[in-house]
């Protein structure tokens, strides 16, 4: 999915060559002229560079030196380290004849029967076959392709090679659900890196096939690994893998070079999946990424872990849900599979924990070609992802509703109306809700841009007037972005608006105005009544219509989520059907073992007019 099929064979050849090279480098030098590696990490924003290499005596050296330091000082230090390393090796071997030192030092024969005294090796750095002057600064001396010579041993200098800075497998793995490793690279690119998956051999199974790298030898006498046929970043275990652990062998790359390979084993075995999920049938409509003229859009409140794990949630809100199905490790598997299966171009998520964004959503969706941005609210926040092959992020214009209302001149008139109602004003300014606004530009046609807004309005059933004011702030801000900053760009406004179609908020969005005598201005009683009329200039439509419900819990069900679109520029190509009522209620309500949230994702294909 992430590489062209025609390139698969070529990548396999490259991967094999890289592994052979790694195995050759891991051993001692066996041929004259063969070179070890000296890895240099030198970043302009940091005062020091690091130098890493292995001496032939087995010791590994990691040096931190000032970038502004003369090269000669480093070479002198390397010579001292090489001499010390050889002295330790010599002490372990009582008899040693006078001969060139394998670690770079030379044996200096003393008179009579006295043991040999070892001299510091000559240490030089060469670039393009010429010695680098010792007064050259480190930052300029250590170039990629240079050769470090310690005595008779030569090291090829690799400056800033691709390297993994973070590599993790999920803590909970289920058959039928994609395993998306969390990885971070320095000087590299996941798309240019190589991946190979292994699974634990079942007891009594045949030994691993010949040719498996020695670095992948069993971690214990009772463990052995067999190679799968998966050479991609993501691996989806089958039922045959249940009860087995997984291993990932990966090599970082940048399109031209490969860095040091790493491997990691899962801390858990593959567990059985839940069977059919509520989104499986929906995926039949979203098997492929849409063509360029379409924008598949998803809006989904994924239920923050900070709310799912409370005693109130377990005993009052979701008492019908199996406790393990509320655990984040379990739900993340379902969320990842559901979202990746939609093959969306734009995904707007609500109730996203910060750690879930960085540790779960980013690794999973990035592996499927999407990139994301995050906006924290208080305990959780909003996330917007976009398909990198279709869009690039042009700019972000996120706001906090209460901060914008208090300080942005754009909302001066609205604030002047609100201050006439002190009780209502106090409640509005206490709310932490935010608006995430991202301007995306088509990668195929730079003249096509789109404003994607994402929000989660105040939740309380009696907070209708608060949601009205929040929506007024949101629409004014979106108008500023889509008219003043980027004149004429269309708008997609997604979110959990906590408002059914019968509420004032929905009436305001669809009709463009709300009268001052609407009942929602007194949604929390006469004390907080704040009569005012509001208008906006957009012509908006709910792309997915008005479903019977998008939220279904034991004590409530109703339509709270919407994808509002700009009718002047966009039209609906298709709406992906929601799960059937039978699917939703199979386990009484949501969330459940087959559905990770108390909300249902909205999915539709939009088309430019």
Swiss-Prot record:
Its cofactor is Mg(2+). One of its GO terms (cellular component) is cytosol. It catalyses: Exonucleolytic cleavage of poly(A) to 5'-AMP. The keyword Metal-binding applies. Residues 100-111, 213-224 have a biased composition (Low complexity). GO terms for biological process: antiviral innate immune response; cellular response to dsRNA; cellular response to interferon-alpha; cellular response to type II interferon; defense response to virus; mitochondrial mRNA catabolic process; mRNA processing; nuclear-transcribed mRNA catabolic process, deadenylation-dependent decay. SUPFAM superfamilies: DNase I-like. InterPro entries: CCR4/nocturin_mRNA_transcr, Endo/exonu/phosph_ase_sf, Endo/exonuclease/phosphatase, PDE12-like_N. Residues 89-111, 206-230 are annotated as: Disordered. Its EC number is 3.1.4.-, 3.1.13.4. PANTHER family: 2',5'-PHOSPHODIESTERASE 12 (PTHR12121:SF37), CARBON CATABOLITE REPRESSOR PROTEIN 4 (PTHR12121). Belongs to the CCR4/nocturin family. This is 2',5'-phosphodiesterase 12. It comes from Homo sapiens.
